């Protein structure tokens, strides 16, 4: 079986996919892009805030809500 190159776009099947930050599912430089197994892979919705480590930045969903409410 031939493996796909690291730079190949896998879209939503990529482990690096994010609908707002990485819609093409491209791997960062130095990382191998692989498709996840949909039977075993689940995205942790609450993990992003934990990984921000105190950085004061709007998360994508918060930014959308703020723009809808007329705030920036």
Curated annotation (Swiss-Prot):
Domain of life, source organism: Eukaryota
Chief localization: cytoplasm
GO cellular component: cytoplasm
Keywords for the protein's UniProt record, in alphabetical order: Cytoplasm
Localization terms from the record: Cytoplasm
Family the UniProt entry places it in: Belongs to the AIM4 family.
Full protein name: Altered inheritance of mitochondria protein 4
Organism: Zygosaccharomyces rouxii (strain ATCC 2623 / CBS 732 / NBRC 1130 / NCYC 568 / NRRL Y-229)
Gene behind this protein: AIM4
């Amino acid at each position: 079986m031939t493996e796909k190159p690291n730079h190949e776009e896998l879209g939503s099947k990529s482990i690096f996919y994010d609908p707002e930050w990485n819609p093409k599912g491209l791997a960062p430089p130095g990382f191998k892009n692989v498709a996840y197994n949909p039977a075993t892979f689940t995205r942790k919705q609450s993990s992003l805030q934990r990984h921000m480590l105190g950085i004061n930045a709007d998360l994508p969903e918060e930014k959308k809500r703020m723009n809808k409410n007329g705030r920036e």
